[in-house]
Amino acid sequence: MPVSAPGPLPTVVEQSGRGDRAFDIYSRLLRERIIFLGTGVDDAVADALVAQMLFLEAEDPEKDIQIYINSPGGSVTAGLAIYDTMQQVAPDVVTICYGLAASMGAFLLSGGTKGKRLALPNARIMIHQPLGGAQGQAVDIEIQAKEILYLKETLNGLMAEHTGQPLDKISEDTDRDYFLSPAEAVEYGLIDRVVDSSGDGGIITES
């Protein structure tokens, strides 16, 4: 099932010659190549998103995949698994922020196909460095500190590549929580445009 926040799950009933068939709303949207990331990012969420992208690639390797993102972020390694798959699959990956894309959510937003990274007008985007903590013997703390530093450098380097910002600016801006409006995110290079109210029903059509 597409990944979204828990709560009542609407169903859609379709009629055919073989009778009525009910779909949960996210499965129905998956048929339109729309995926939702509406939770924090962990291994289970990453597995679900990766599986959906691979399925949609197998269905049609030339048609865009759309990922709607409303996520506070989460596990860096799980997020990188999603990111690597976004870069690997043949279809272009359209990313659309609705609500909030923070931390790993913002990173995934920026990792969509260039020219196809979008945000709704009242969305918020926040970037910062990876969070982590360690306890135990000094050698264990040192190992964890090195890993956090490695992940920070990896994420900053990739974000610099996707935004066009200098690496030192990315490092400085992500030292603390850094919030942006959609217009500011366009200027920063995190996204490419803000979705207007064109009455297209929320489906981002291919240009």
From Swiss-Prot:
GO terms for biological process: protein quality control for misfolded or incompletely synthesized proteins. Keywords: Cytoplasm, Hydrolase, Protease, Serine protease. One of its GO terms (cellular component) is cytoplasm. Its main location: cytoplasm. Its EC number is 3.4.21.92. The active site is at 103 (nucleophile), 128. PROSITE patterns: CLP_PROTEASE_HIS. InterPro entries: ClpP, ClpP/crotonase-like_dom_sf, ClpP/TepA, ClpP_His_AS. Belongs to the peptidase S14 family. This is ATP-dependent Clp protease proteolytic subunit 1.
